[in-house]
Amino acid sequence: MSFSPASSEPHDAPAAAGSSVPASRSIAERWKMEAAPIRARLLLRAFAWLFSLLALVVMATDVHGRGGAQDFSTYPEYNYCLGMSIIALLYATAQLVRDAHRLSSGRDLVAGRKAAAVVDFAGDQVVAYSLISGLSAAAPVTDYMRQATDNLFNDSAAAAISLAFFAFLAISLSALISGYNLSLEAIV
């Protein structure tokens, strides 16, 4: 039981006899509070999916001219960034399907709450670090090429790197929520 600073009455105290106002929060209010991190994580993963898809499309279509210096596949750093965007897209897709199933049916596809919390946290961490690794490999190449010339190829590469960064932000914020959920599972 916890006490309110304004009064000495506990929050979980039963309602007074004959009173229609309960002293504790209702079950619906508690359910809404417990579901807020789940909905926030679902929204963040949807953003990660969108930004990963856009980064993948922009990078994969960054072919200006007939090969040579203006083709993303010429640069291993861009291929690495593209690969990390693909991994993030696949991970976000799997997690979105899993979260949607969890919200609709009330059951998780991963057996055990603690195992599911570990999968969420570890997966978010690995994918977030992979994304930041991919975009940090591609950013210096784009910066170096922009010093020589500023063209559509460099602008498209910079846009893809920025979108990968936004996907990283969404997944890393999702990792914070997953870490919070994992800490609750470790306590319970």
From Swiss-Prot:
Keywords: Cell membrane, Glycoprotein, Membrane, Transmembrane, Transmembrane helix. It is a multi-pass membrane protein. Residues 64-76, 136-156 are extracellular. Its main location: membrane. Homodimer and heterodimers. GO terms for cellular component: plasma membrane. Residues 1-21 are annotated as: Disordered. It is found in: Cell membrane. Signal peptide: none annotated. Residues 1-42, 98-114, 178-188 are cytoplasmic. Belongs to the Casparian strip membrane proteins (CASP) family. The lineage of its organism: Eukaryota, Viridiplantae, Streptophyta, Embryophyta, Tracheophyta. It comes from Hordeum vulgare subsp. vulgare. This is CASP-like protein 4B3.
